[in-house]
């Protein structure tokens, strides 16, 4: 799957991923009204609004982008209907030939990680039949439990030709409480980065490993160090736009070939119509605002890489 991601990034010229992280406050009133009219002000109604919101954004942007990243918590909050909306979103994005990064941040003891990996990246056998539960192409993984929590995911990736993005240095302000702690004079995130490179060497695609890393845009100097530690790992870069990251801050996350990183923007794209720069589109044309935000993001990052 890493080969497909790289191929689509080259084809679109867009090293970006749209984070499908819907909150009800992002969804235009006309979509909410229609969903509530059909299902009431219920979990089912909220999930229907989320699904229709996602569908419009995907319809307006899929030809510009290589991938989407639905954050599962935004669906879990609506219970079973929300999870059904998550699955519908994944399936619809697949129908548009998008790469799907399941932002699930899983990680547990071996048997539990194996179940998580099966659910999100693999297949499950039920009697004589086999099913694909969610069917994402990549999953985000928390490595805090160590190798026996990560290896089950790697095993499924090898079997299914899927991929991982392992949390290394996250974009949130308090990430340094643990990730920056020194061990033998070196920050923990560097040691995790070395482990990602080691895991990644086991399963290489044509140019890059199936095993990538999450490194926040808000820490560009750390990203520069980690790029050198993990030269064959794709880096998923959250924190662009709404969290403060800009194209010029991101150049060190990329290799000299202009590849090696994919930058995420969530509310900066899906709620673009709420921003002053895109207010002219209005709530009725929120999908067009999202498309314009994608085009601006591509131009920003491409311009920064060209000037590197």
PLM region descriptions:
Residues 108-211:
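Conserved anion-binding
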Residues 250-256, 271-308:
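C-terminal helical cap(s) of enzyme catalytic domains, especially alpha/beta-barrels
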């Amino acid at each position: 799957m890493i080969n497909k991601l790289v191929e689509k990034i080259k084809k679109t010229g867009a090293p970006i991923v749209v984070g499908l992280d819907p909150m009800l406050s992002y969804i235009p009133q006309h979509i909410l009204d229609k969903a509530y009219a059909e299902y009431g002000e219920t979990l089912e109604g909220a999930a229907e609004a989320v699904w229709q919101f996602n569908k419009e954004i995907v319809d307006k942007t899929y030809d510009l982008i290589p991938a989407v990243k639905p954050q599962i918590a935004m669906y879990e909050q609506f219970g079973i209907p929300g999870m059904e909306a998550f699955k519908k979103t994944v399936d619809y994005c697949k129908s548009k030939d998008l790469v799907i990064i399941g932002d699930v941040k899983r990680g547990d003891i071996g048997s539990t990680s194996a179940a998580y990996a099966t659910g999100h990246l693999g297949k499950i056998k039920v009697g004589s039949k086999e099913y694909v539960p969610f069917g994402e192409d990549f999953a985000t993984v928390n490595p805090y439990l160590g190798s026996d929590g990560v290896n089950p995911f790697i095993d499924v990736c090898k079997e299914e030709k899927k991929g991982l993005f392992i949390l290394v240095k996250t974009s949130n302000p308090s990430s340094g409480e643990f990730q920056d702690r020194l061990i033998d004079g070196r920050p923990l995130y560097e040691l995790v980065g070395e482990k990602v490179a080691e895991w990644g060497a086991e399963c290489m695609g044509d140019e890059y490993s199936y095993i990538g890393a999450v490194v926040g845009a808000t820490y560009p100097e750390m990203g520069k160090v980690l790029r050198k530690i993990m030269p064959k790992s794709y880096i998923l870069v959250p924190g662009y736009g709404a969290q403060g990251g800009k194209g010029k801050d991101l150049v060190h996350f990329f290799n000299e070939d202009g590849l090696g990183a994919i930058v995420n923007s969530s509310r900066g794209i899906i709620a673009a119509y709420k921003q002053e720069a895109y207010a002219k589109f209005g709530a009725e044309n929120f999908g067009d605002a999202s498309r314009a935000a994608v085009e601006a993001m591509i131009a920003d990052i491409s311009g920064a890489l060209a000037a590197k």
